[in-house]
């Protein structure tokens, strides 16, 4: 049974015997959440499960959101805590309707991941476990950028043809974009010391599929594919909608372009340029990996 309480009662609720704290704040709210937890706990915080997906830049390095939260929790001295992260395809409406859903819970300690999975598993919610916290976190974040690119497939599949042809024949192009997305995700995950094989799982391909099939990032991608600039599409089509891929591109885009040449990550950098430079999407098909 779910009980909903006002935020003002948070202190009272968390001071009870708590098994797990689930954080689902926005990426910009990570430090705020850390501050609130430190107001309640002084020596030890119950197990934390982070649902937020994203990456940050700290001291010119990529920072996982679990590390950002850890840094916030340690800002006032030593305190005991353990943070896990959740990844995988889990659209809210489907979950609310209790359709079969598979996710992956990651913790550097696989035994801790297994322990927490037992709290969450039920007849429709299936929790896999992983000790590749980096791979799960990074895959979950960057798949938003790639789902935007795949969402553009219908518009960019071929120039100067009718909309009818694009509507019927864009799937070849979408598949090529998916293949390139997975290839690049593995490069980036490996660069950040995660496991390439994690991209093949729920946090990578699984979440990429769901996001590309109709999420907010894919929707923005469709507008970019139609030739709109990001600012025009945001203002006229998605003004009050959060587009996670755009937030991530602004956060890590410049760092990406310092660390990689366009030939290394041609699809990601094409999307980053379209967003951060506010230019029309120009996918460099000729740079794709066809090995």
Predicted regions and their residues:
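NAD(P)-dependent Rossmann-like dehydrogenase/reductase catalytic/cofactor-binding core
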Residues: 143, 150-158, 168-169, 175, ...
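Hydrophobic alpha-helical packing residues
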Residues: 37, 69, 184-189, 252
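Short, small-residue-enriched loops and turns at beta-alpha junctions
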Residues: 55-58, 136-137, 210, 241
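Alpha-helical architecture
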Residues: 50, 86, 141-142, 205
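Glycine-rich anion/phosphate-binding loops
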Residues: 27-31, 127-130, 271
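Internal alpha-helical scaffold of NAD(P)-dependent oxidoreductase catalytic cores
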Residues: 40, 74-82, 100-197
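Rossmann-like NAD(P)(H) cofactor-binding subdomain of soluble oxidoreductases
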Residues: 3-11, 15-98, 116
């Amino acid at each position: 049974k779910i009980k909903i309480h006002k935020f003002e009662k948070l202190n009272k609720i968390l001071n009870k015997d708590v098994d797990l704290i689930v954080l689902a704040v926005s990426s910009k709210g990570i430090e705020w959440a850390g501050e609130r937890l430190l107001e309640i706990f002084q020596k030890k915080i119950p197990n934390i499960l982070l649902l937020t997906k994203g990456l940050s830049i700290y001291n010119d390095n990529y920072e996982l959101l679990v590390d950002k939260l850890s840094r916030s929790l340690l800002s006032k001295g030593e305190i005991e805590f353990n943070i896990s992260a959740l990844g995988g395809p889990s659209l809210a409406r489907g979950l609310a309707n209790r359709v079969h859903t598979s996710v992956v819970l990651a913790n550097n300690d696989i035994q801790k991941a297994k322990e927490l999975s037992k709290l969450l598993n039920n007849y429709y919610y299936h929790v896999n476990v992983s000790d590749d916290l980096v791979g799960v976190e990074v895959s979950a974040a960057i798949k938003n950028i790639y789902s935007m690119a795949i969402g553009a497939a219908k518009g960019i599949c071929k120039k100067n043809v009718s909309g009818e042809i694009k509507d019927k024949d864009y799937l070849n192009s979408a598949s090529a974009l998916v293949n390139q997305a997975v290839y690049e995700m593995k490069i980036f995950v490996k660069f950040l010391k995660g496991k390439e094989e994690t991209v093949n799982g729920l946090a990578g391909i699984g979440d990429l599929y769901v996001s590309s099939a109709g999420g907010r990032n894919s929707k923005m991608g469709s507008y970019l594919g139609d030739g709109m600039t990001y600012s025009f599409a945001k203002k006229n089509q998605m003004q009050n909608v959060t587009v996670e891929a755009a937030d991530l591109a602004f956060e890590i885009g410049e760092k990406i372009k310092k660390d990689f040449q366009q030939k290394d990550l041609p699809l990601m950098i094409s999307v980053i340029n379209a967003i951060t430079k506010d230019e029309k999407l120009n996918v460099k098909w000729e740079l794709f990996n066809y090995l």
